[in-house]
Amino acid sequence: ISSAIDPDPRLYANDLVDSLSSKRPVLLSFSTPGFCFTKTCGPQVDILTRLADKYSNIIDFIHVEIFENPNEMLLEGDYSIGRQSEIVYLWELTTEPWTFYIDENGVIVDRFEGFVNIDEIEESIITNRIY
């Protein structure tokens, strides 16, 4: 599920539980490209795509849409009918975007609230050397 105009299928190919079970590090981003109040979610998802181009052989990239019904919201043109995804409640996220770098043991080694640029994420990947 994504509110992105042209979603990158690689960001939706992996499930967090499966990635962690297979001992692969994960770059996980919670955002809503089509409905982001800060207007940074679309660019954040674009950065995930650029990083996936470079690191998808060693890291799983996962985008989680904030809303469970973005298509309905788009069709109706009504933000107020948006229903937050259950995982957003479980992670207790009250803002967006959020990006987490999780190692192969399931430990969050870095987290970023709000927009994070590609250099900061790459620095985290290199510093945490989980590959």
Region roles according to the model:
Residues 1-4, 131:
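Extracytoplasmic/periplasmic copper-protein system
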Residues 2, 8, 15-37:
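Short active-site neighborhood of thiol/selenol oxidoreductases, capturing the structured segment around
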Residues 7-12, 78-82:
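Short gly/ser/thr-rich secondary-structure transition/capping motifs
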Residues 13-14, 38-55:
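Typically the conserved alpha-helix immediately C-terminal to a functionally engaged Cys/Sec
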Residues 24, 58-59:
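A generic structural signal for alpha->beta connector loops
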Residues 56, 62-96, 101-108, 123-130:
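Thioredoxin-like thiol-disulfide oxidoreductase module
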Residues 115-118:
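A short acidic/small-residue loop/turn micro-motif
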